[in-house]
């Protein structure tokens, strides 16, 4: 089948008419499938809107054209839908998982998560997937009959297990919810969830290249250090010998996304043909993931990540901002712990001990945007780093 063409619904896809349901029973919609309702609920959530002002790599005020968690999530959803369409999967469920996957991230990207995890080291740590689950099952308060978004079982398991079965210690927030609504943490997630996870990898690689070029951290010609990118650039230069670097970079990103989507789709089709699943049940109980990069492409993808690690994520300019961002998160956590009156009224009401107090504080900080975290730091401290 040509890439981009919609395949018929596959028997191993998640069928909305056979969903395992919601924690709180609801009458069916007359106009939308259960998975479409899930997707719409994510889009209309407060947490989703906050992603507009949460960092991907560059802090929110560095430029209007850099990616935020929101634009990244939209791009992941676009890639995920393309893959789902090719494989005959449920596009609405796939989109739900792509849009929801970053809801639990704290401000300042991975720097904020590292800082919050250190602050919570004595209380179980901080995990953004567990935080996402808390958001969609408790923290969003938009409906009269339940807290959270009351998503389907399939959406919840995909949020928790999109990177595979949970092995080793399970974050407390996930374990507690799993005791109420068994998400089969030991098994793989649906193909829709596996697609969303690979789409996240593709989006990261391609769009961090785009942002790094825009920021001047490296050039198109620098990217020739990566063999796969060198081959793509050579083809671009052969077809468009007079193209300026801005358009060369944009064409490189487009071609890379197309190449990776086709590679993942082809590998998934090969694995599915070998495994011969006839239901989502078979997918979940398979010995390994059915959606993945082919081995040679996985090597190329690792090389891209290594380049970005050295030339972008470890760039002194980025590192300086991230160190300051970590300090801001740690400062806020320490001040809130020291003086609970600096938190909004009622935030610590009914706390049962030091661990619960720390967890409440981590929830408050995790919900902040970059901008609000800076505003809070200005309010509580005499000196706040300039994240530029």
Curated annotation (Swiss-Prot):
Signal peptide: none annotated. CDD domains: HDc. It comes from Bradyrhizobium sp. (strain ORS 278). The keyword Hydrolase applies. It comes from the Bacteria. This is Deoxyguanosinetriphosphate triphosphohydrolase-like protein. InterPro entries: dGTPase, dGTPase-like, dNTPase_2, HD/PDEase_dom, HD_domain, HDIG_dom, PHydrolase_assoc_dom. Residues 1-32 are annotated as: Disordered. PROSITE patterns: HD (PS51831). Gene3D superfamilies: Hypothetical protein af1432. Belongs to the dGTPase family. Type 2 subfamily. Residues 69-205 form the HD domain. The keyword Phosphoprotein does not apply. Disulfide bonds: none annotated. One of its GO terms (molecular function) is dGTPase activity. Keywords: Hydrolase.
């Amino acid at each position: 089948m040509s890439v981009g063409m919609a395949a018929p619904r596959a028997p191993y896809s998640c069928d909305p008419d056979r969903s395992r349901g919601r924690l709180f029973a609801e009458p069916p919609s007359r106009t939308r499938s259960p998975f479409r309702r899930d997707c719409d609920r994510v889009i209309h959530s407060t947490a989703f809107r906050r992603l507009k002002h949460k960092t991907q790599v560059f802090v929110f005020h560095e430029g209007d054209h850099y990616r935020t968690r929101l634009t990244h999530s939209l791009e992941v959803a676009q890639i995920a839908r393309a893959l789902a369409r090719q494989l005959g999967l449920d596009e609405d469920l796939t989109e739900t998982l792509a849009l929801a996957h970053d809801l639990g991230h704290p401000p300042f990207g991975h720097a904020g998560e590292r800082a919050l995890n250190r602050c919570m080291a004595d209380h179980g740590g901080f995990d953004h997937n567990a935080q996402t689950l808390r958001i969609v099952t408790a923290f969003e308060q938009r409906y009269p009959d339940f807290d959270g978004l009351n998503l389907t079982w399939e959406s919840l398991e995909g949020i928790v297990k999109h990177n595979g079965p949970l092995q080793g210690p399970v974050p407390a927030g996930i374990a507690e919810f799993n005791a109420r609504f068994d998400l089969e943490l030991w098994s793989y997630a649906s193909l829709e969830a596996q697609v969303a996870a690979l789409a996240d990898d593709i989006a990261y690689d391609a769009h961090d290249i785009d942002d790094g070029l825009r920021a001047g951290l490296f050039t198109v010609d620098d990217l020739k250090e990566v063999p796969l990118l060198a081959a793509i650039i050579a083809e671009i230069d052969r077809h468009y010998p007079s193209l300026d670097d801005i358009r060369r970079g944009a064409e490189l990103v487009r071609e890379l996304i197309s190449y990776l989507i086709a590679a993942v789709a082809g590998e998934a089709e090969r694995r599915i043909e070998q495994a011969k699943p006839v239901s989502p049940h078979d997918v979940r109980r398979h010995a390994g993931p059915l959606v993945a990069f082919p081995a040679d492409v996985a090597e190329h993808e690792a090389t891209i990540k290594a380049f970005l690690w050295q030339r972008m994520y470890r760039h002194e300019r980025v590192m300086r901002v991230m160190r300051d961002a970590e300090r801001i998160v740690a400062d806020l956590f320490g001040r809130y712990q020291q003086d609970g009156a600096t938190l909004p009224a009622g935030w610590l009401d009914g706390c049962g001990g030091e661990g619960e107090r720390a967890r409440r504080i981590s929830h408050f900080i995790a919900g902040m945007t970059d901008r609000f975290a800076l505003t809070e730091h200005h309010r509580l401290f005499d000196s706040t780093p300039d994240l530029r």
